[in-house]
Amino acid sequence: MITGIINLKKEAGMTSHDAVFKLRKILHTKKIGHGGTLDPDVVGVLPIAVGKATRVIEYMTESGKIYEGEITLGYATSTEDSSGEVISRTPLTQSDLSEDVVDHAMKSFTGPITQVPPMYSAVKVNGKKLYEYARSGEEVERPKRQITISEFRRTSPLYFEKGICRFSFYVSCSKGTYVRTLAVDLGIKLGYASHMSFLKRTSSAGLSITQSLTLEEINEKYKQEDFSFLLPIEYGVLDLPKVNLTEEDKVEISYGRRILLENEADTLAAFYENRVIAILEKRGNEFKPHKVLL
């Protein structure tokens, strides 16, 4: 069975699950998962784990993400992105808003902030996904979540036309951030209805869009028995603290035994001869093998 990490460039119009389903058909294997869901309209980096690498995919979802996109001020939608129905309008012209005001407002969102996930999201409340409530017209109290915005800035001039204002942006954020909600909250701060009109994820789990491949490109490589699209499993633990093991430690780990290590981390990626062989978890003064990858 093939094993590794794929830096997939997801295209618009497909869910993250659709991408996994198509890769299973291309690679003729069922053991495939994704790290970090992308909405159907969002394009960009979707980390994929194949084979044994699926055992470390949970650690890929912990990392921060980088996005580039577009915010439109002037009207809001039911889904907070361009796919929803228009629910309110606040027309504006060039005399109503300056770039300095926008930049100042964007800067106020950096650091730890509280965010309420959108109704059209997969967050569960009482065992039911929020979008299921939304589709049936029900409004429920949504759990607040703590996120961190490392950087949020404008990357284009403000473009005004027919009562709306559009501009491009860059955001670096923690896992669990809803960028479309960030776009809506920015609009509220500026005093206008708004939504996220485009979004592209350019980096996730240490994978960059500059090296990502489309499904079509992966399919062509696989047909030619070119497996260069598969990155080593070690790419799945880039964000974990690492420790190099002795041969004696490796043997103990292979039997599922605990080992003594001087390390303050709660979770470690254990390496032997430059290969990740286990995920270790702290238990008192010892580390227990949580996942053995030998």
From Swiss-Prot:
<protein>
    <recommendedName>
        <fullName>tRNA pseudouridine synthase B</fullName>
        <ecNumber>5.4.99.25</ecNumber>
    </recommendedName>
</protein>
<dbReference type="GO" id="GO:0003723">
    <property type="term" value="F:RNA binding"/>
</dbReference>
<feature type="active site" description="Nucleophile">
    <location>
        <position position="39"/>
    </location>
</feature>
<dbReference type="GO" id="GO:0031119">
    <property type="term" value="P:tRNA pseudouridine synthesis"/>
</dbReference>
<keyword id="KW-0413">Isomerase</keyword>
<dbReference type="Pfam" id="PF01509">
    <property type="entry name" value="TruB_N"/>
</dbReference>
<keyword id="KW-0819">tRNA processing</keyword>
<dbReference type="Pfam" id="PF16198">
    <property type="entry name" value="TruB_C_2"/>
</dbReference>
<dbReference type="GO" id="GO:1990481">
    <property type="term" value="P:mRNA pseudouridine synthesis"/>
</dbReference>
<comment type="similarity">
    <text>Belongs to the pseudouridine synthase TruB family. Type 1 subfamily.</text>
</comment>
<dbReference type="InterPro" id="IPR032819">
    <property type="entry name" value="TruB_C"/>
</dbReference>
<dbReference type="InterPro" id="IPR014780">
    <property type="entry name" value="tRNA_psdUridine_synth_TruB"/>
</dbReference>
<dbReference type="GO" id="GO:0160148">
    <property type="term" value="F:tRNA pseudouridine(55) synthase activity"/>
</dbReference>
<dbReference type="InterPro" id="IPR020103">
    <property type="entry name" value="PsdUridine_synth_cat_dom_sf"/>
</dbReference>
<dbReference type="InterPro" id="IPR002501">
    <property type="entry name" value="PsdUridine_synth_N"/>
</dbReference>
<comment type="function">
    <text>Responsible for synthesis of pseudouridine from uracil-55 in the psi GC loop of transfer RNAs.</text>
</comment>
